[in-house]
């Protein structure tokens, strides 16, 4: 079978992208012909083809381009033409849905929407971000008008999709790469690298530094923890996708908070192994892949009892 998988980016730091890469490799192992189409990519794929369509380099321009991607009809048309002859197109996130939408409309290629969800707009910090997320959700809904079937990554997302679009979907939980994320990994070298002493406890958060991840609340909670347990450090690993929000987080932090914008994907399991507890204050997660990965590494997880967390957090 010839399968196309669409994702806006293919980077190691993105949970959705790791899901896409694992999915592509699994299909390829079953001897399907797999091509991943992305606007931007860093990793070099093994076992499947990659077609990078391109987008602006500036973070601000990227956000605008992705929101208004439907205006770049030439790129959508050219990408959809490449999908002729494919048996199925799986679109993982807006704005790639527009390519699948057009391929379905023009060439009758089967269109499967993989629902990772979109964070609630009210969780964002200013009026421009709220408006952006409202428009993002609106355009996403339009791009789903002709889907053949949908997959949701949790029961929470299944309910949200039904409520927002009336689309029925099948629940398929994200898979963890159990060869990489497992118990028994030695995180000693990472602790030494970070300067964590034997008598100190290390808390870990992994994820994009976005307002809906509620990292500012995590920092406030950590301050309270630090008052009672002064030998505690908090490591935050994530790309600052909202520069002003990142500045706010840095200003809220003291010497006991360590920020790392980038961690080599091969090293990520060792960071989970190095921590004593995985923590998140996120108020919206379609699945929360880092929490699942931390649990696979044998770590307890502390999270709010909201969104998909009751389904995902089993060792908290």
Located regions from the model:
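Glycosyltransferase donor-sugar binding loop
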Residues: 42, 176, 206, 233-246, ...
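Short His-centered aromatic/hydrophobic patch
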Residues: 91-96, 115
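Membrane-proximal helix-turn-helix segments that form the acceptor-binding/catalytic region
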Residues: 132-149
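Carbohydrate-associated surface elements
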Residues: 156, 175
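Conserved donor-binding/catalytic core segment of Leloir-type glycosyltransferases
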Residues: 197-213, 219-222, 235
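Nucleotide-activated donor-binding/catalytic signature segment of Leloir-type glycosyltransferases, i.e.
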Residues: 246-263
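Short alpha-helical donor nucleotide-sugar binding micro-motif in glycosyltransferases
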Residues: 270-275
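Aromatic "clamp/platform" in nucleotide-sugar-dependent glycosyltransferases that forms part
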Residues: 283
């Amino acid at each position: 079978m010839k399968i196309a998988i669409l994702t806006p980016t293919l980077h190691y730091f993105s949970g959705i992208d790791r899901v896409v890469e694992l999915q592509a490799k699994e299909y390829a192992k079953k001897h399907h012909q797999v091509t991943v189409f992305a606007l931007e990519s860093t990793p070099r794929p093994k076992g499947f083809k990659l077609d990078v369509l391109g987008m602006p380099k500036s973070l601000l321009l990227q956000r605008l381009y992705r929101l208004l991607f439907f205006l770049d009809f030439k790129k959508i048309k050219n990408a959809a033409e490449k999908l002729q002859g494919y048996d199925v197109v799986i679109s993982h996130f807006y704005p790639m849905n527009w390519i699948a939408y057009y391929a379905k409309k023009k060439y009758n290629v089967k269109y499967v929407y993989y629902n990772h969800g979109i964070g609630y707009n009210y969780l964002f910090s200013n009026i421009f971000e709220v408006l952006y997320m409202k428009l993002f959700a609106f355009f996403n809904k339009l791009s789903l008008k002709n889907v053949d079937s949908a997959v949701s990554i949790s029961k929470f997302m299944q309910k949200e999709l039904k409520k927002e679009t009336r689309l029925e979907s099948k629940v398929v939980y994200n898979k963890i790469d159990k060869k990489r994320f497992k118990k028994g990994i030695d995180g000693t070298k990472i602790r030494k690298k970070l300067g964590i002493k034997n008598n100190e406890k290390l808390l870990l958060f992994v994820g994009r530094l976005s307002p809906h991840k509620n990292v500012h609340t995590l920092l406030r909670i950590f301050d309270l923890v630090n008052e009672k347990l002064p030998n505690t450090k908090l490591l935050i690993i994530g790309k600052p996708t909202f520069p002003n929000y990142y500045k706010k987080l840095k200003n809220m932090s003291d010497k006991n908070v360590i920020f790392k914008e980038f961690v080599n994907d091969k090293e990520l399991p060792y960071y989970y192994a190095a921590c004593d507890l995985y923590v998140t204050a996120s108020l919206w997660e379609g699945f929360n892949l880092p929490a699942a990965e931390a649990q696979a590494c044998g770590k307890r997880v502390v999270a709010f009892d909201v969104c998909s967390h009751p389904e995902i957090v089993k060792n908290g």
